[in-house]
Regions:
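Internal, conserved structured core segments that host functional sites
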Residues: 130-181
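Alpha-helical scaffold segments that form or flank carboxylate-/histidine-based iron centers
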Residues: 47-58, 77-95, 138, 163-175, ...
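Conserved alpha-helical segments that form or flank metal/cofactor-binding pockets of metalloenzymes
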Residues: 2-24, 88-116, 183-186
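Glycine- and acidic-residue-rich phosphate-binding/metal-coordinating active-site segment common to enzymes
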Residues: 159-209
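Acidic/His metal-coordination segments adjacent to aromatic residues that form catalytic metal sites
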Residues: 36-56, 116-142, 159, 192-196, ...
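Helix-loop segments that flank and shape redox-cofactor active sites
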Residues: 42-47, 65-87, 149-164
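Extreme N-terminal leader/anchor segments
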Residues: 1-43, 47, 310-332
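Extended, helix-rich structural scaffolds rather than catalytic motifs
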Residues: 3, 7, 198-332
């Protein structure tokens, strides 16, 4: 969903200043042709490090992103909604696994990436550090959060790094379903009682501005986007993606019957887009830097789940060791 740390100062190594080599020339030719780099191909160290940071942050976000909604699995209002939510949370876990696998093709270990997350050295999307106090929040996550994720992720299907691009094709298909189920859940609530409609509106009020922050800092403050664009990692700027999302969401909100909490939101005929209010970037940076409503809770929950699941990983390794031993005996 979720690659905000690419725009955080200091997160990307500077480009090598060495004279261009034949390998660099081949890499540049692939970039110029808008081709694909595969794991066995030579690539600049800065390109590799940028991808490791982006893909690992994306993977961390998928895994941590299970928590706000997973909190509601046991309290879903119906068997149908519970089954849908179970499937969705399972999908998010799968997305994390796809993306960790893609990161591993760059020569890093999954354990090292997870250790960095648990130590607080790696980032995940700031959006998952907000609470989900009502069932309507689950629907709004599907509609707005996953809707913003789709807007961010579709261009990644054309990323120049092959394993990442291919993983994103499946992820985007599943995220599209998540967005539709979130909207459907809210639509059902909006057909209900006054209390249910009020609950939906309150959830929209809570999530609208944090969702707009998901696209990352304004282009003027995005220190690494230019190089990522040259490498074909970042295809569309933060502000352009945010604008596309706002334009698409306004009509959806009208169908749903909710009001987006921005008094400055209005159509600008001259621009052909909606104008919207000023985002509170101070809040964004507070949450990114660990001072959000749920940062400590989210990280503690992930660490506990990882520790509690150690026996599963150990059992899987023991089973694989036995399987290999039996295979060697049969081959002898």
């Amino acid at each position: 969903m979720y690659t905000q740390s690419l725009d955080i100062p200091g997160n990307v190594a500077p480009l090598d200043a060495a004279a261009e080599s034949p390998e660099q020339a081949r890499f540049d030719a692939v970039m110029a042709a808008d081709g694909k780099i595969e794991p066995q191909d030579w690539m600049p160290d800065a390109y590799r490090k940028t991808l490791v940071r982006q893909i690992s942050q994306h993977a961390h976000s998928e895994v941590v992103g299970m928590l706000p909604e997973g909190n509601w699995i046991s309290r879903a209002p119906s068997l149908k909604r519970k089954a849908i939510l179970l499937a969705k949370v399972q999908d998010e876990a799968g997305h994390g696994l796809y993306l960790y696998s893609a990161a591993e093709t760059l020569g890093v270990s999954r354990d090292s990436l997870i250790d960095a997350l648990h130590a607080g050295k790696a980032k995940y999307s700031s959006i998952f550090n907000y609470p989900t106090p009502t069932w309507a929040d689950v629907g709004v996550i599907g509609w707005l959060v996953d809707g913003a994720a789709i807007m961010n992720q579709i261009p990644l299907c054309r990323c120049t790094y092959g394993p990442y691009a291919r993983a994103m094709i499946r992820v985007c298909k599943e995220e599209s379903f998540h967005q539709r189920q979130g909207f459907d859940a809210l639509l059902s609530m909006m057909k209900g009682t006054d209390a249910q409609r009020a609950m939906v509106q309150q959830a929209v009020d809570r999530w609208w501005w944090p969702v707009l922050m998901m696209f990352g800092p304004s282009d003027a403050d995005s220190v690494h986007s230019s190089q990522s664009a040259k490498w074909g990692i970042k295809r569309i700027s933060n502000d352009d993606l945010r604008q596309k999302f706002v334009d698409a969401t306004v009509d959806q909100a009208k169908v749903l019957g909710v009001t987006l909490p921005d008094p400055d939101l209005k159509w600008n005929e001259a621009r052909g887009h909606h104008d919207y209010g000023t985002i509170d970037w101070d809040e964004f940076w507070r949450v990114v830097n660990g001072d959000g409503p749920c940062n400590k809770e989210r990280l503690a929950t992930r660490v506990k789940a990882h520790d509690d699941g150690a026996w599963v990983r150990e059992a899987a390794l023991a089973h694989e060791a036995k399987r290999q031993a039996r295979a060697e005996q049969h081959a002898a």
